[in-house]
């Protein structure tokens, strides 16, 4: 058990905490303040505060109490020291969580810098876009001004055009002048005076002459209007030239405005692209912030766990601070009472709780090792090993998940067992693997464990990070899916090849059946040779059909027996007959081909007759 000592006088309290003092000595300087000088013992004279030696001070002391003061009474109290303890696994997790948090913070800062760069780029584009927008606005104002200027001229031209159209509409069906009207009436009278026309024709001409005489006033009026319109031709030409000139100016302004608008469109497209990138970076920043907050929460949880494990140490620090305050105030009885209560409380917990004893033993290991003591507090023997292994930090458990999954992947990628391997060979091959697996826990247990008093739950395997485990599972699923797709593709290819071979065989079979039917039809006048050839062909077809039929799955041993039985038979093999060249006469296929050629010639002749003789005759009629 490790304790801290405390010494206290009536005017001060001194406490010792291990090698360091728990309480600071506080000397009473009332006498020095009253005299205003510092006393130096062991010298022959007394030096004042300003460095001069006083003659009055060289005189012998007047009182014996000043010469031989009473020794100060010192009170010593001992408190049980509670050390802080850092769990190696928890410390490794804290370091790993801190690294992850720093990585997340750096990643977020990189995204934030990229976002700031994109925003500055967007502001630069906007600064380039503002003068172009102002220039476009000026061009719009110029175009609108010219359009306002050309509007009254277009109205006047429209007025002239409407008057001309109205005059043309009124003069539709009328003569353009009086001379033309008189000439037309004269021509009609000449036709009437001609004796060869009929009475009806003469009446019609007389009626037409009357109608023309009735339109004389309208013709005169239209002629006057036309003369008036001719007077405004110069004015219309001037207005038209003005409109044309203004239109040319508008076209030039529109051309310049279109160039500015093209630049504006390019910049707007750039702004839209930058806005999309900014939105994507903003989403990434939100996700990075969420990841950073999650990592920081995990780090805080681990810190809370560490602080929760060191609750007794924090209580000890609080008690030490209160003892320091009481000793500074000189309250000896309060310090004594507090010391008694704390010691009784500690001993009660020590006697009643085994977990408390184990926790305390773990906490003082570092202190015992620094003072070269053994686990039970005695001096360490020369041949005794130090207990420094207790404080070593275990390596992080996140480095081990990758090799743990390799055997599973290798087992998946390993080829299937061959058919010639017997079960006995498989058992013999599996035996060394089982022996190696059985030796692995022995090797792990052979490692010297210094924590003999710790509970066995600390010997559990290091935990695998859930994120990495999920990633490895996802990779395994992807590989499984790839293998399944490859298997399906191979199966589909095999099925397609089988279907193609089956279709080819069926086509060959149908072709052979057609040839056989044709030979039977044409072989009505054949002799014995043709009959023998037909029989041989039939036999060959039957043999080939038997060969094309899918053979039933038969083992190798049965095939060997079948071959042995066949070799023992005395009957000749049918292969010589099957491979014999088929004899086919010329007349078996020449007659159908000749009939087909004759039919084609007749059809071609009918088509030519219809195209060149029948159709022209029908169109001429």
From Swiss-Prot:
Q: Which UniProt keywords apply?
A: Cell membrane, Coiled coil, Membrane, Transmembrane, Transmembrane helix
- GO CC term, one of those recorded: plasma membrane
Gene label: BIP131
InterPro entries referenced in this protein's UniProt entry, alphabetically: PPI1-4 (IPR055282)
Q: What induces it?
A: Induced by brassinolide.
Q: Where are the transmembrane segments?
A: 589-609
- The superkingdom listed in its UniProt entry is Eukaryota
- The protein in question is named Proton pump-interactor BIP131
Membrane protein topology class: Single-pass membrane protein
Q: Does the keyword Coiled coil apply?
A: yes
**Major site of localization recorded for this protein:** membrane
């Amino acid at each position: 058990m490790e304790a801290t000592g405390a010494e206290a006088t009536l005017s001060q309290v001194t406490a010792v905490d291990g090698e360091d003092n728990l309480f600071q000595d506080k000397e009473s300087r009332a006498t020095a303040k009253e005299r205003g000088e510092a006393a130096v013992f062991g010298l022959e004279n007394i030096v004042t505060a300003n460095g001069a030696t006083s003659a009055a001070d060289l005189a012998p002391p007047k009182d014996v109490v000043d010469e031989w003061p009473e020794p100060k009474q010192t009170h010593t109290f001992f408190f049980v020291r509670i050390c802080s303890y850092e769990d190696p696994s928890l410390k490794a997790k804290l370091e790993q969580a801190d690294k992850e948090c720093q990585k997340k913070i750096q990643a977020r800062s990189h995204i934030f810098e990229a976002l700031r760069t994109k925003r500055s780029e967007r502001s630069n584009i906007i600064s380039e876009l503002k003068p172009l927008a102002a220039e476009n606005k000026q061009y719009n104002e110029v175009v609108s001004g010219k359009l306002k200027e050309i509007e009254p001229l277009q109205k006047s031209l429209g007025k002239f055009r409407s008057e001309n159209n109205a005059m043309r509409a009124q003069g539709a069906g009328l003569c353009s002048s009086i001379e033309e009207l008189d000439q037309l009436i004269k021509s009609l009278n000449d036709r009437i005076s001609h004796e060869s026309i009929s009475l009806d024709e003469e009446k019609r001409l007389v009626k037409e002459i009357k109608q023309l005489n009735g339109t004389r006033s309208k013709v005169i009026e239209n002629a006057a209007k036309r003369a008036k319109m001719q007077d405004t031709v110069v004015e219309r030409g001037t207005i038209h030239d003005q409109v044309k000139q203004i239109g040319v100016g508008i076209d030039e302004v529109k051309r310049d405005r279109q160039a500015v608008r093209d630049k504006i469109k390019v910049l707007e497209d750039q702004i839209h692209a930058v806005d999309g990138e900014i939105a994507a970076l903003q989403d990434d920043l939100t996700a990075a912030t969420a990841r950073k907050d999650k990592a920081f929460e995990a780090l805080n949880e681990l810190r809370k766990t560490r602080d929760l494990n060191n609750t007794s140490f924090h209580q000890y620090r609080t008690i030490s601070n209160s003892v320091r305050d009481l000793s500074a105030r000189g309250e000896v009885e309060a310090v004594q009472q507090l010391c008694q209560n704390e010691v009784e409380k500690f001993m009660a917990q020590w006697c009643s709780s085994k977990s408390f004893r184990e926790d305390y033993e773990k906490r003082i290991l570092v202190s015992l090792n620094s003072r070269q003591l053994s686990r039970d507090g005695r001096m360490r023997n020369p041949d005794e090993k130090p207990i420094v292994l207790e404080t070593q930090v275990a390596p992080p458990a996140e480095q081990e998940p990758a090799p743990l999954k390799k055997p599973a992947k290798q087992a998946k990628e390993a080829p299937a067992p061959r058919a010639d391997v017997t079960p006995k060979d498989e058992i013999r091959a599996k035996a060394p693997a089982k022996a190696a697996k059985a030796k692995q826990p022995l090797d792990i247990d052979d490692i010297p464990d210094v924590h003999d008093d710790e509970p066995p739950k600390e010997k559990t395997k290091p935990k695998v990070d859930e994120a990495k485990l999920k990633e490895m599972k996802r990779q395994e699923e992807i590989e499984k899916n790839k293998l399944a797709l490859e298997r399906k593709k191979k199966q589909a290819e095999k099925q397609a090849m089988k279907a193609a071979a089956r279709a080819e065989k069926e086509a060959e079979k149908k072709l052979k059946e057609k040839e056989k039917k044709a030979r039977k039809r044409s072989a009505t006048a054949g002799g014995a040779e043709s009959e023998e050839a037909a029989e041989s062909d039939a036999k060959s077809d039957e043999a080939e059909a038997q060969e094309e039929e899918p053979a039933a799955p038969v083992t190798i041993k049965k095939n060997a027996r079948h071959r042995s039985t066949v070799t023992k038979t005395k009957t000749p093999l049918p292969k010589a007959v099957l491979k014999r060249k088929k004899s086919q006469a010329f007349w078996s296929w020449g007659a159908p081909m000749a009939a087909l050629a004759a039919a084609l010639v007749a059809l071609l002749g009918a088509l030519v007759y219809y195209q060149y003789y029948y159709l022209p005759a029908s169109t001429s009629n």
